[in-house]
């Protein structure tokens, strides 16, 4: 499972992909109705595909994006699906040039009925990455190039800022391939790059972002030494004027996603550097105190990763509730299995 969204205690969606009996990746979309998670039929394109992000604007207005493998053209193409309350239908996304693949990775609501997606394009699937941004205006998707599209970079997180704008985060690559945090802001008219702190001598990237207010935005990712070992969480905060680094508990691993807790704090979820260990969660309360929160128990010897997290509005009278999704990697041997965990949610499906 790669993405999750919730509108309330009886309306949540999780998306991802699975390998079918023929060894082909096909999309997965499951809905939680307050009692249990149930699979929906979501066709791929040309018999394949995967979904990386989902956004629910209403019970009959849900978007999911990802990519599908166009084998004859030797490129991956962007994929968008829309749920109308009864079924998923495909909606065309902008086409990329020959041999240039496109991967939308995150979704967020814009002004009015707009929906935005950000991600990356790449030549021959992996070379010369460039950030992408698509906007749905109620009738069609169109490309709105991010700032700095001449640089090798990608965008993997997106959030509405509460004032009609958007924050997109990811990574920009230097001449030697070293990563540095990338943050871009949409002000309603154009994208602009906003400087983000970077630790010299370390490769750093942002993966997820959430905005509690225009002057209270959180971004999470990874900070690693040149050899790639010893990865530690990277957490940045925007106060309306500048991005600053936040000190968090020392964990060997990285957060992939972040969301508000509904009480002035935030949750960040991710994976540990040792893939045989459980996923991890970090919580910051409204007073600024961070703590490490263990996930639910998994099977012995089974590692797990969280890739996305969302708050469930009104889910628990005792406090905010969350859904986190990801996958397991039993004993480091495929196949991966989906993980869906609830925090502060009692009853079936938790």
Can you name each region flagged by the protein language model?
Residues 1-350:
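Residue-level hotspots at or immediately adjacent to binding/recognition sites across diverse folds
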